[in-house]
């Protein structure tokens, strides 16, 4: 019996095959927006997330333009958009809609296993690509990271444990994302940020904390660990006051 991540990657292989049948990448270059620049101060990457394998439907009928506009008005430094359809009920259309509304960096949040997905994300308006170490061989990670650079985009290289972290450090990527969620079990443990953050601080690398961030106390905790930003989805998608959440993020430590 495979893990949740295994099932997702198998589905991605099907989607990649379909993309090669139905999609022809465009060659035009376009302007992009930098997350690295945004992370010069503590930044919230606010996510458009309709559903997830662990929570089921979160906000299935979200008005993407309105949500993205609210995020930007409240002070988000970037917006993340789930483009996976099978497990998270997102789409590249959501990414395109977000791009039409936003002038801040946009992350394509998906399980990227092939260059053609990066081409599709680029065309949809992404500035940032998520590369998940747990989903890729070292060779494939290197290949896709170099392709992200070739496209003029930035990468968030995502890790969950020490072994994945060492692989990511060797890439010297734009940004490392510590995912507090174990993608094999989907359990969340915020202490991963503290454990792995120490090593990243030693290397003086730019990093953010992802998943399981719901409160002012969580924000304080990840800031103290040295994170330069947080990626927040569920808490914002279910919040009755998005502006209050952003106010909590301004807390000084």
UniProtKB/Swiss-Prot annotation:
Its EC number is 4.1.1.48. It comes from the Bacteria. Keywords: Amino-acid biosynthesis, Aromatic amino acid biosynthesis, Decarboxylase, Lyase, Tryptophan biosynthesis. It is an enzyme of class 4 (lyase). NCBIfam families: PRK00278.1-3 (NF001371), PRK00278.2-4 (NF001377). Belongs to the TrpC family. This is Indole-3-glycerol phosphate synthase. It comes from Bacillus mycoides (strain KBAB4).
